[in-house]
Amino acid sequence: MQTPPESTDVKLDTLNEPSAHLIEKNVALPKDIFRSYLSYWIYEIARYTPVMILSLVIGVLVLLIIFFNDNEACVFNSAIFAFTSLVGLLIILSDGNPKLVSRRNFRTELLVDVITRKPAVEGKEWRIITYNMNQYLFNHGQWHTPYYFYSDEDCYRYFLRLVEGVTPKKQTATSIGNSPVTAKPEDAIESASPSSRLNYQNFLLKAAEIERQAQENYWRRRHPNIDALLKKTE
């Protein structure tokens, strides 16, 4: 397994840095660090405390069954507890999106970063956003490693689920680009308090507007004649 470059320690709290494109090239995500998704998955599981505890319990119970196989009561009770622990372990392993990562402060942090950077569909900005979110989860104790999102695609899919069903007010690309953003990424935790629910909804609507415009730009680049095709179907 490779080690992340020292440049990943660069602070990316603002977008005022003139060399943002250079920072993006040096940001290392888990998919760049690990040889495969399997090695990444094993690394994450091995550092997840509930998994380690349950694995240790199962191991001890199996040893009890082996060494005390002539004691029916011990074997029976150990087998019951081992089976229960195994079920719990499988439930934890199958939980790919823990509740910790659905906390309002994290979602607000993600929305503010999207609003600030205005990423394109499949844009390089998503690498920086993903790196920031991984660092945020780790630094705030919401995840046990700084590698929650394996790739920028994973973070982007999470964002799409977040804004799914949100109907933004239709704006032009110019109006979106010129709209003032009064919130800063470091203010996201405060904005996520229960008394600031309206701010969160505003962030959600704004991020949905940016994503809608990014989708329009993406499909227009891929199909320059899309407007003519749409007129024919009317």
From Swiss-Prot:
Extracellular membrane side: 69-72
Membrane topology annotation: Multi-pass membrane protein
COPI binding: annotated span: 231-234
Positions bearing Phosphothreonine: T3
UniProt keyword annotations, A-Z: Cytoplasmic vesicle, Endoplasmic reticulum, ER-Golgi transport, Golgi apparatus, Membrane, Phosphoprotein, Protein transport, Transmembrane, Transmembrane helix, Transport
Disulfide bonds: none
Segments in the Cytoplasmic topological domain: 1-47, 94-234
GO process terms (BP): protein transport; vesicle organization; vesicle-mediated transport
Coiled-coil portions: none
Bilayer-spanning residue ranges: 48-68, 73-93
Subcellular location: Endoplasmic reticulum; Golgi apparatus; Cytoplasmic vesicle, COPI-coated vesicle membrane; Cytoplasmic vesicle, COPII-coated vesicle membrane
Pfam families in alphabetical order: DUP
GO-annotated cellular components: COPI-coated vesicle membrane; endoplasmic reticulum; ER to Golgi transport vesicle membrane; Golgi apparatus; membrane; plasma membrane
Function, as annotated: Involved in protein trafficking vesicle formation, probably by stabilizing of coatomer at the Golgi membrane and thus allowing the efficient formation of COPI coated vesicles.
Family of this protein: Belongs to the DUP/COS family.
Subunit structure and binding partners: Interacts with MST27. Binds to coatomer proteins of COPI and SEC23/SEC24 of COPII coated vesicles.
Additional remarks: Members of the DUP240 multigene family are specific to S.cerevisiae sensu strictu. Cells lacking all 10 DUP240 proteins show no obvious alterations in mating, sporulation and cell growth.
Name of the protein described by the UniProt record: Multicopy suppressor of SEC21 protein 28
